[in-house]
């Protein structure tokens, strides 16, 4: 389970050896300043050269080398839109962790409040990380294409959903999907996610039924993680299709394109 926590909550634990601060921003951002004791684990490190998620053993090596042991509690933080932290948190959920925290304010807000930031790399203490795969949070291409009664939530831009984007080989969306643009779920005034009441209003307006299993997707998974974390927070049974539309459009499965003749 992933919980969003305040900057004050993080500040009181930032030097506690039972917690590990994980900067999920891209490496260049990390080098330009980071929280005390933070190690850098951005999403690109979670995939191989073919764009596939690492194996459980590779994840164990990655997170163990970063200092995340089985008895250490992770605290993630991010920049303005929350995609990276949401995706890294989902990965940790998939690996069986249920003690994940994300700082709800963005790094720039932390810095703007006059809190300490640091610039030197943090020495890492390697620890044992044991994956305990939780397959219930992950949806495969086979699952999405063969399971009846799913609610598919497309978190890409409206242009992508409507088949108006040149970024897709086969423009459109997975048949039957509902559009909820991920940016509508991002918070304001230095917060990563929108208020729970606003998130509920957006989800209700999209007519997403809480009694159905929901699968979020985007192009390659990161934007879908924002939708995943939002829906999880609202009590939905939700999975993330990490192959997302990039895998779907290559599969030869049907595509719905409202923009086609």
Could you describe each region identified by the protein language model?
Residues 1-58, 150-167, 173-181, 191-198:
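N-terminal intrinsically disordered, low-complexity segments enriched in P/E/S/T
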Residues 2-6, 108-172, 253-261:
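Active-site neighborhoods of enzymes that stabilize oxyanions during catalysis
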Residues 17-19, 71-73, 149-150, 210-212:
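Loop/turn elements at helix/coil->beta-strand transitions in domains of secreted/extracellular proteins
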Residues 22, 40, 73-76, 152-154, ...:
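Structural recognition of the beta-strand scaffold that forms the well-ordered cores
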Residues 46, 54-143, 172, 211-212, ...:
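Thiolate-centered catalytic microenvironments shared by cysteine-dependent enzyme domains
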Residues 194-210:
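A short, acidic, amphipathic alpha-helical segment used as a generic capping/interface helix at domain edges
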Residues 237-261:
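Cysteine-dependent PTP/DSP-like catalytic domain, specifically the C-terminal lobe
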């Amino acid at each position: 389970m992933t919980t969003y926590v305040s900057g004050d909550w993080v500040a009181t634990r930032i030097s506690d050896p039972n917690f590990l601060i994980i900067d999920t921003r891209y490496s260049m951002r990390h080098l330009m300043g980071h929280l005390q004791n933070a190690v850098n684990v951005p999403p690109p490190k979670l995939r191989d050269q073919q764009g596939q998620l690492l194996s459980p053993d590779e994840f164990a090596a990655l997170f163990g080398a970063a200092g995340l042991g089985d008895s250490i509690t992770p605290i993630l933080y991010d920049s303005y839109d929350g995609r990276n932290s949401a995706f890294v948190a989902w990965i940790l959920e998939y690996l069986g962790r249920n003690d994940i925290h994300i700082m709800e304010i963005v790094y720039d807000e932390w810095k703007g409040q006059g809190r300490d930031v640091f610039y030197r790399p943090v020495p890492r203490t390697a620890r044992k990380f044991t994956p305990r795969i939780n397959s219930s949070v992950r949806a495969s291409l086979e699952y999405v294409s063969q399971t009846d009664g799913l609610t598919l939530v497309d978190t890409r831009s409206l242009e992508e959903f409507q088949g108006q984007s040149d970024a897709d080989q086969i423009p459109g969306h997975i048949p039957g999907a509902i559009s909820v643009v991920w940016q509508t779920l991002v918070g304001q005034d230095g917060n990563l996610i929108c208020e729970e009441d606003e998130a509920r209003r957006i989800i209700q307006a999209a007519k997403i039924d809480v009694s159905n299993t929901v699968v979020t997707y985007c192009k390659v998974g990161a934007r879908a993680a924002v939708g995943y974390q939002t829906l999880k927070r609202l009590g939905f049974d939700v999975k993330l299709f990490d192959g997302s539309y990039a895998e779907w459009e290559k599969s030869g499965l049907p595509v719905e394109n409202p923009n086609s003749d």
